[in-house]
Amino acid sequence: MRLLLLTFLGVCCFAAWVVEGVGTEVLQESICVSLRTQRLPVQKIKTYTIKEGAMRAVIFVTKRGLRICADPQAKWVKTAIKTVDGRASASKSKAETIPTQAQRSASTAVTLTG
């Protein structure tokens, strides 16, 4: 009886492990049914994607993870895109100019021996 129960438990665990991976390769498709007309505060926007198709839209992703569709021709949307792009390039250039700990140590060592 215990062997049967142990075998059944093993089969259940194996089935759960196999089924867990099914469907993970399917991409999440964002579909806009309506476009937001009210302005979204730019400081709440984390990133965006541009959706082409039957309904062209810009999909903003907020810092809380919400997806909001907006009209790509709206003036506030164009301004928000420029701001988010500027924020991304500013943080990228800032990351490139900050020296690492090893670089700081090397420059200190050169200063001390010079």
Curated annotation (Swiss-Prot):
Biological-process GO terms, alphabetical: antimicrobial humoral immune response mediated by antimicrobial peptide; cell chemotaxis; cell-cell signaling; cellular response to interleukin-4; cellular response to transforming growth factor beta stimulus; chemokine-mediated signaling pathway; chemotaxis; establishment of localization in cell
Task of the protein: Chemotactic activity for lymphocytes but not for monocytes or neutrophils. In thymus, mediates medullary accumulation of thymic dendritic cells and contributes to regulatoy T cell development, playing a role in self-tolerance establishment.
Bias type Polar residues, positions: 98-114
Family statement drawn from the similarity comment of this UniProt entry: Belongs to the intercrine gamma family.
GO molecular function list: CCR chemokine receptor binding; chemokine activity; chemokine receptor binding; protein homodimerization activity
Pfam families with a match to the protein in the record: IL8 (PF00048)
SUPFAM superfamilies (alphabetical): Interleukin 8-like chemokines
Alphabetical keyword list: Chemotaxis, Cytokine, Disulfide bond, Secreted, Signal
Gene Ontology CC terms, in alphabetical order: extracellular space
Subcellular location: Secreted
Protein name per the record: Lymphotactin
Signal peptide (from-to): 1-21
Gene (UniProt): Xcl1
Record-annotated disulphide pairs: C32-C69
Gene3D superfamilies per UniProt: 2.40.50.40
Region (Disordered) residue spans: 87-114
